[in-house]
């Protein structure tokens, strides 16, 4: 089991890339997760795909993450297709995770504010009515709770009295409160105190606003929070907020979710266990990922693309600050040699990104680029740029002295 905490780093020379390889994955042992937790048998060698993290708050998407209303949503779109020329396949493939108001603007081409507001209510009423019809005629739940959800929410709700009554978990959905406020009780799930809906924000997912508001409502830092999502649009929103992101393969194929590079990934939420850690005032989460995904990937910084760049806990804007971080900084996917104008290293604003178009090619700038590249590859923080430059200059002087010595010997 891997445990991610802030690690100290002191540079005695130039930092070197971390080239060590993770241990080979152990054979899959289905059903061993709960037993291993109870017996304390999870070890770094036998269970490298299981990780433990501590976070200040847990922020959930709703549809596709906690509940499944897909059959009812399909029927609602079929109803709207009678009035609007819609490509249902395209909508069902692309619209999941977006606010209803944004979806109707895009695909139904509705621009009149009053008509748009009334059609949002009509669409979400159609979902609720369809769910009721499905339950009545099939005997199945029109809105079903996904695996592991009820237990996880119950675990998160325990010991709330030790948190001054704060739940520290929230739902951040793209649905309106009109729909979400009914769907959660219909599914038999608890309604959280912090309930962010489409009505709460002016910009929905993939913008970070829903999760920033959710973290704020939980009195938590987004950088010390975990977003739980099932859709690419939502994953982008969570990553843009600066939070860690856990993807669940409950509505999309794993390959599609992996393209968004979530920090963690599970088949469903039955693979996540939670408990309150009173010593740190955080939730401890144990996440069992697929056996072939034992090294979580760090969240690429896309915030400058969507929202003004924000200081992340793994960025060099926090050098010298002694504050705990749950973010894994041990693996960075790209060095400066691979960067494009749409990438950044350790949270730098777009304009100052090493490798971005228009970057200054001066010696000073190249030293800074090299610093970012090496630090990002080694996954280490706490080194100042001045210290790096001094080390770089020292090594250059040493190489010149060696070169001059070799020339003297040749003469």
Swiss-Prot record:
Root EC class: hydrolase
Biased composition annotated in UniProt, kind: Polar residues: 14-23, 326-345
Pfam families tied to this protein: Hydrolase (PF00702)
Domain of life of the organism encoding this protein: Eukaryota
Binding-site residues for Mg(2+), renumbered to this chain: 61, 63, 338
Sorted UniProt keywords: Hydrolase, Magnesium, Metal-binding, Phosphoprotein, Virulence
Active site, UniProt feature: 61 (nucleophile), 63 (proton donor)
GO molecular function per UniProt: metal ion binding; sugar-phosphatase activity
Claim: Cytoplasm is one of the keywords in the record: no
Record note on disruption phenotype: Decreases virulence in mouse intranasal and intravenous model for infection. Sensitive to: high temperature; sodium dodecyl sulfate (cell wall stress inducer); Congo Red (cell wall stress inducer); dithiothreitol; Calcofluor White; salt stress (induced by KCl). Simultaneous disruption of CRZ1 results in phenotypic enhancement.
Keyword Repeat appears in the UniProt entry: no
Modification comment: Phosphorylated.
Basic and acidic residues bias locations: 362-373
Residue segments, region Disordered: 14-33, 296-386
Enzyme Commission no: 3.1.3.-
Classification via InterPro entries: HAD-like_sf, HAD-like_SPP, HAD_sf, PGP-like_dom2
Family from the record: Belongs to the HAD-like hydrolase superfamily.
Role, per record: Probable phosphatase. Required for cell wall integrity and virulence.
Name recorded for this polypeptide: Probable phosphatase HAD1
Organism: Cryptococcus neoformans var. grubii serotype A (strain H99 / ATCC 208821 / CBS 10515 / FGSC 9487)
